[in-house]
Design a protein with these regions (language model features):
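C-terminal, helix-dominated tail/subdomain
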Residues: 108-145, 150-152, 264-273, 294-312
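Short, glycine/acidic-rich hinge or "gate" loops at secondary-structure transitions
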Residues: 24-26, 79-82, 99-108, 145-150, ...
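Aromatic-rich carbohydrate-recognition surfaces in CAZymes
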Residues: 1-99, 127-128, 135-138, 267-284
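Active-site core of glycosidic bond-cleaving carbohydrate-active enzymes
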Residues: 1-16, 64, 71, 81, ...
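Acidic/His metal-coordination segments adjacent to aromatic residues that form catalytic metal sites
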Residues: 35-54, 108-123, 251-263
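Aromatic-lined, polymer-binding surfaces characteristic
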Residues: 97-129, 214-221, 227-231, 268
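Non-catalytic C-terminal accessory modules of carbohydrate-active enzymes
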Residues: 47, 228, 235-332
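Glycine- and aromatic-rich loop/turn segments at beta-sheet edges
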Residues: 20-33, 95-112, 116, 162-171, ...
Length: 332
């Protein structure tokens, strides 16, 4: 539903000046969006929480969302007037945020990771990968508009490190050595980011971190289910998907709690994960610069078909059918 997506980005654009003030207050250029935004756009996170000043991947998330909206709608007027300003200012933030320690070592130090057990760490996998993608998206947006991108965006993007263990498993942050994690972090590099596409690396990361996740927020199982489906494991994906929402359902309205057995409802992030599993996992959808496309996908044996309606600006319907284990997909 592009109008709803646009309204969310409109909220960010209308508060861009507040994000610019926030960046300046921390000694950076560009825009630094708050972790918990007040109506004014100022940081509203309680002062005792480290997420406010340090969980800075939110800034990259805003930029990536702007580019995704353009990719779906191809609305150049919007990109020129609102999308590119968001992308430019968030990219400028990262060029000032990195510590330039030489080629391949433009480190992002002292952050709270997407895995919020990891606080005040350096070179967090998700933060670094999201910053890289934000910088690359800003350059792509500039080229769409016929504007020369700041060459430092590409320079910084290619020098932000993604750390790995000797066997190729992505390391969550500098010094990470197998500690328990709260929620998905490294796993996010395969989806929704595009930092890792190699199936063997994604599988290795899922196996390694899946054994280390605590009983955390509901959205983690959604990421695992999406990636498992994309790896050609529909039955494993279905079991993960079902676990992710069944264990978090709260009567009488079947709302989704933040943590299994918790009464903190309604947890919108968990509900969003449920929806994304249907669209980008079992539904096979993917946002690309050419628009929404559909990948080959397989349904679990428990389902005969899956119908997705009202997708994208043209309100397409996608039907995925399972027949003799040879599912078909069609768009109308």
């Amino acid at each position: 539903q592009p109008p709803i997506a646009r309204s969310m980005l409109q909220y960010r654009f209308d508060r861009l000046s507040g994000a610019e003030r926030n960046a300046a207050a921390h000694g950076y250029r560009g825009a630094m969006f708050p972790w918990e935004s007040g109506a004014s756009g100022e940081e509203d996170t309680p002062v005792w929480a480290l997420t406010g000043p340090f969980e800075q991947h939110i800034t990259a998330d805003v930029g990536i969302a702007a580019w995704n909206y353009y990719c779906v709608t191809h609305d150049k007027y919007w990109l020129q007037s609102e999308g590119y300003p968001l992308l430019k200012e968030t990219a400028d933030f990262w060029t000032s945020r990195v510590t330039r320690n030489g080629p391949g070592r433009y480190d992002i130090v002292n952050v709270v990771a997407a895995d919020e057990f990891a606080q005040n760490v350096d070179d967090n996998a998700f933060t670094n990968a999201a910053a890289r993608e934000d910088l690359e998206d800003a350059s792509a947006a500039a080229r769409v508009l016929g504007t020369a991108p700041d060459p430092d965006w590409a320079n910084v993007a290619k020098n932000i490190p993604i750390l790995k263990f000797p066997d190729g498993t992505v390391r969550e942050y500098a010094g990470y050595n197998g500690q328990q994690t709260k929620q998905a972090d490294v796993e996010l590099l395969g989806y929704p980011l595009h930092a890792i596409s190699d199936s063997s690396t994604i599988r290795r990361d899922l196996d390694y971190y899946g054994a280390r996740i605590a009983n955390g927020p509901a959205m983690t199982q959604s990421i695992y289910a999406i990636l498992q489906e994309r790896l050609g494991m529909p039955e494993t994906a279905f079991a993960t998907f079902e676990k992710g929402y069944r264990s978090h359902e709260v009567a009488p309205f079947d709302t989704i709690s933040e943590v299994a057995g918790d009464t903190n409802v309604y947890f919108a992030t968990g509900a969003g994960g449920f929806l994304q599993t249907m669209l980008y996992g079992f539904g096979g959808l993917e946002i690309t610069p050419q628009g929404i496309v559909q990948r080959p996908t397989r349904l679990p044996a428990e389902w005969r078909s899956l119908t997705l309606t009202g997708i994208g600006p043209h309100l397409k319907t996608y039907v995925i059918r399972s027949s003799d284990q040879k599912p078909k997909a069609a768009a109308h």
